A protein has these predicted regions:
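Short, conserved beta-strand element in jelly-roll/cupin
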Residues: 44-48, 58-76, 114-118
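Conserved short histidine dyad/triad with adjacent acidic residue
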Residues: 25-30, 43-59, 94-95
């Protein structure tokens, strides 16, 4: 399927606020949904100035990739803070380090974000000491301290 630049511009963006961080706000245009894709999430996101893209997190099963289209910001990748701008790329492999982006500019930070759409995933939020289990549409959030690791 094909989407023209004009069709993408005309798509209505959905404002999303992260469930764990009210400062993590983005406008999401799901390009993949618009053409019927089900296995990959492909989104154009716009992060307003002074906001984060998401809560600092990492995925245990889904890979994620980010390509900066316009604007500027700072990506936190593990312990590193990296200035980002148009043409920069961030790859987030499974079991990688936690990551987030912050828009420190005065215009929207616009990125193309691509990620898998598995039925199950586990995301860790290390700053909050939380883990999110996602299983076929059901989401369960737990404190890291409450996770009992069982030896096999």
């Amino acid at each position: 399927m094909y989407l023209s630049a004009q069709a993408i511009e005309a798509l209505e963006g959905v404002r999303k606020v992260h469930l764990l961080d009210a400062k993590a706000v983005r406008i999401n245009k799901s390009l993949g949904d618009a053409v019927g894709m089900t296995q990959l999430g492909i989104h154009q996101i716009s992060v307003p100035p002074g906001h984060f893209s998401t809560e600092f997190h990492c995925h245990r099963y889904e890979e994620e990739a980010i390509y900066v289209l316009s604007g500027s910001g700072v990506a936190t990748i593990g312990d590193c803070k990296q200035p980002i701008g148009p043409g920069d790329f961030i790859g987030c492999p499974i079991n990688g380090v936690a990551h987030e982006m912050y828009n420190d500019g005065d215009e929207p930070l616009v990125c193309l974000v691509v990620g898998q759409r598995l039925a199950q995933d586990v995301s860790d939020y290390p700053r909050l000491g939380k883990r999110l289990y996602r299983n076929s549409g059901e989401w369960s959030l737990v404190d890291h301290a409450d996770i009992e690791h069982v030896a096999r």
